[in-house]
Amino acid sequence: MAVRVVVGTQWGDEGKGKYIDMLAEQSDIIVRFSGGNNAGHTIVANGVKYALHLIPSGILHTDKTCIIGNGVVVDPAVLLQEMKGLNERGVTTDHLLISDRAHLVMPYHKELDVLQEKFRGSDSIGTTKRGIGPCYVDKIERSGIRMCDLIDENEFIRKVKANLKLKNLIIERVYGGEPFEAEPIIKEYLGYAEQLKKYITDTTCILADAVDEGKNILFEGAQANFLDVDFGTYPYVTSSNPIAGGVCTGSGLGPVYVDEVYGVLKAYTSRVGAGPFPTEQNNEIGDTIRELGLEYGTTTGRPRRCGWLDTVMIKYTAKINSLTALAINHVDTIGKLKEIKLCVGYKKDGQIIRTFPASLNELAKCEPVYEVFEPWNEDISNVKLFSDLPQNAQKYLNRIEELVGVKIGLIGVGKDREQIIKVF
């Protein structure tokens, strides 16, 4: 039995889907454990591009069980649309299961998300306005509606009506918005219930049984460490815990069963939306990285901010997640630049530091300290062995390992899931 976890080490969009898809081949069960459809994975298989937002990337493997865990918040309309899109392309979703403890994103969550961002003005967080944050708020304040409620008609109706009493007051009196009527929501969501009920079950018990049976389980992280509500660049974060620790709370599996944790990173850094970014290159270099790496959001289509790889961040992530291996993408992309810089520390108040500050005010005082590397400018898309990489690429990767303190196990040299060097 092997229980593996794949997490992002930066601000998301690191290319986790490709490695998840590869590791899924060795797994019996693939689990999504946090976030909602504010995250996105892109997989390229046999030249076909699949963009997934809720369904685990392992769905392409029809002999595997795919689970949406209790830590995920589910917009049923989005989920059903995603299922339909897969079905239309010949991919079955019959092997998908949804935790009966997962919370539902409701129409008023999405409306509140929009109204709150508008209200914040210049202090807006930069949410995707998909209702994820307000849904997690309801979960924590114990007024959320779960999948088990969706398939219990009387309970669902009761909860919707009870919630709207307060939600409509907030929408109308605080934000000046239009109130919701209960009946249209009830009718819409009971329609979703009819379509989804066969997928909804107690997935915690299924995972416990799988462990007892010695099955291989893969936990698919969405987003990344620096979007974590506790360990990210707060408040420019998501509303959940997409770190390895979130596996346990987002699925019900105990921590002693986790064997391996892969941390996925790019050979540079990117992020979408507002928030600090110490190594950002708001210049021609950043523009070049964006174009070479096709850095546009899977979910939003927004251009991503781009900059140099920051090993202070990656080392911090390695500690938080107990990483056992790194998986690095875009080694082919970064090698095309005229020169490559690697952040090895920060200079703050005249001192060199190698830790990541919690305070954004303190982080703003940090100036990246760089080492410069020569590019390789070679086509490495078909390289299968680390030793066959250009010497300049090997030097860059070896230095990353040295600074982070974790070995690189997987190296992405192209978009396709087959374009991976397996170091160990």
UniProtKB/Swiss-Prot annotation:
EC nos: 6.3.4.4
Record-listed GTP binding positions: 12-18, 40-42, 304, 330-332, 412-414
Active site: D13, H41
GO cellular component, one term: cytoplasm
Residues engaged in binding substrate: T298, T299, T300, G301, R302, P303, R304
Pathway note: Purine metabolism; AMP biosynthesis via de novo pathway; AMP from IMP: step 1/2
Residues reported in the UniProt entry to bind IMP: D13, E14, G15, K16, N38, A39, G40, H41, T128, R142, Q223, T238, R302
Residues holding Mg(2+): D13, G40
Record-linked CDD domains: AdSS
Entry-linked SUPFAM superfamilies: P-loop containing nucleoside triphosphate hydrolases (SSF52540)
Location within or outside the cell: Cytoplasm
Molecular function terms from GO: adenylosuccinate synthase activity; GTP binding; magnesium ion binding
Cofactor notes: Binds 1 Mg(2+) ion per subunit.
A biological process from GO: 'de novo' AMP biosynthetic process
Main location group: cytoplasm
The reaction(s) this protein catalyses: IMP + L-aspartate + GTP = N(6)-(1,2-dicarboxyethyl)-AMP + GDP + phosphate + 2 H(+)
Keyword list, A-Z: Cytoplasm, GTP-binding, Ligase, Magnesium, Metal-binding, Nucleotide-binding, Purine biosynthesis
Cofactor(s) required, per the database record: Mg(2+)
InterPro entries in the cross-refs: Adenylosuccin_syn_GTP-bd, Adenylosuccin_syn_Lys_AS, Adenylosuccinate_synth_dom1, Adenylosuccinate_synth_dom2, Adenylosuccinate_synth_dom3, Adenylosuccinate_synthetase, P-loop_NTPase
Family recorded in the similarity comment: Belongs to the adenylosuccinate synthetase family.
Biological function: Plays an important role in the de novo pathway of purine nucleotide biosynthesis. Catalyzes the first committed step in the biosynthesis of AMP from IMP.
Description of how the protein assembles with itself and partners: Homodimer.
Protein name: Adenylosuccinate synthetase
Protein's organism: Ruminiclostridium cellulolyticum (strain ATCC 35319 / DSM 5812 / JCM 6584 / H10) (Clostridium cellulolyticum)
Source organism phylogeny: Bacteria, Bacillati, Bacillota, Clostridia, Eubacteriales
Gene field: purA
